[in-house]
Amino acid sequence: MSYQQPQLRGPLQRETDPSDRESLVSGHEHGGKSSQSAAVFNVVNSVIGSGIIGLPYSMKQAGFPLGILLLFWVSYITDFSLVLLIKGGALSGTDSYQSLVNKTFGFPGYLLLSTLQFMYPFIAMISYNIITGDTLSKVFQRLPGVDPGSWFISRHFIIVVSTVTCTLPLSLYRDIAKLGKISFISTILTAVILGVVVTRTISLGPNIPKTDNAWVFARPNAIQAIGVMSFAFICHHNCFLVYGSLEEPTVAKWRRVIHTSILVSVFICVLFATCGYFTFTGFTQGDLFENYCRSDDLVTFGRFCYGITVILTYPIECFVTREVITNVFFGGALSSVFHVTLTAAIVTAATLISLLIDCLGIVLELNGVLCAAPLIFIIPSACYLKLSEEPRTHSDKLMACVMFPVGAVVMVAGFVMAITNPQDCTHGQEMFYCFPDNISLTNISHSPRQLTA
């Protein structure tokens, strides 16, 4: 097994104009074609995967007013950089994120990008398993006649069973276009989950005391919050796959897909973040469903829907992880046997790691600042600045010049803060307001940590 220099194929060996109608993804591996609506659902599904559950937590970190502003800003940067990547692919005549960076910055850049592009979806797969185990274990505990202490409804058992029966078989698909209908189902379930969160904001929120300074404009952990938001919004690692699945893909068509996808995603994300934070303020956990009481049947239904949503999102991340390894070590092509073997190895590794980790918040933060920030802010802008022949005063170049240093600050400062100032995690604990004797509290002057002990 050794590194294979990526090769450009077919008509894309020539330089292309951004408006060129050639596909930027070769057809041998991703031959299926999808409509624009299916592509929109794939992008939305990738955005509102596991990351959305941590957005209320990002409001707690940044301060609610600043958090909302940052959420809109990250969504705008995401939209801009996704279009920028495809423009860069057209300018360089390349058909993947990896080959774009390879042609722009050579082998060192290619190796760095491949590492990041592998790490992000792989860590996302781990977070999906954590969420699946946490949410579905609480769902099965509510079934009549089920012993809450049974090993068969433990998070570890559920992670293993869901992997073997659901996520692994779905991840064996070769064609991402076939996931369009699955992504549509996942998006519908997300709307149901949003309805549950909104309902509980109205019915449960007034009964939970608000923490001190709940509505302060800004907090010191705002950079970590950007990491969580970046984790939620990033889908750059699979944008060439989705672009290549379009019928007659063009930059103009891709721009419409991205604008629609981000608009839908930001509406869902802002509403979810607002309602989640309004309900729990300073008590908000990295996994919002950890805040709700286990006896709440409506939330139990929401947990079930979210668990299914995450399971259906998992294969998209596995696609990218497998593609990176295929391009780096196998020259972009796998036999059927190697395809199955590699997929099983990736899924198994993610499963084993997820069995050892309980707390979702730190996973979201670190993946956001270490992987998502460079993939969203730094690399797309660096590639475009080097490839584009537009004047320095062109709006795209000016925006790219802003994105690059901002991404570097988020990456370095966010990592330092995540390590030196880790947030509390109350995984598996029932919150204080779930007990009848505590629900009457009206004035809280203690820290959330004291009250969840």
Curated annotation (Swiss-Prot):
Membrane topology according to the record: Multi-pass membrane protein
Keywords noted in UniProt: Amino-acid transport, Ion transport, Membrane, Sodium, Sodium transport, Transmembrane, Transmembrane helix, Transport
Superkingdom, taxonomy of origin: Eukaryota
Any one of the GO BP annotations: amino acid transmembrane transport
Pfam families the UniProt entry points to: Aa_trans
Region span, Disordered: 1-34
Record carries keyword Ion transport: yes
UniProt biased composition (Basic and acidic residues): 12-32
Tissue expression: Widely expressed.
InterPro entries to which the protein is assigned, alphabetical: AA_transpt_TM (IPR013057)
GO molecular function, a single term: secondary active transmembrane transporter activity
Transmembrane segments: 39-59, 66-86, 106-126, 152-172, 179-199, 222-242, 262-282, 299-319, 337-357, 359-379, 399-419
One annotated Gene Ontology cellular component of this protein: membrane
Keyword Ion transport: yes
Localization, UniProt: Membrane
Protein family per UniProt: Belongs to the amino acid/polyamine transporter 2 family.
Function according to Swiss-Prot or TrEMBL: Putative sodium-dependent amino acid/proton antiporter.
Name of the featured protein: Putative sodium-coupled neutral amino acid transporter 11
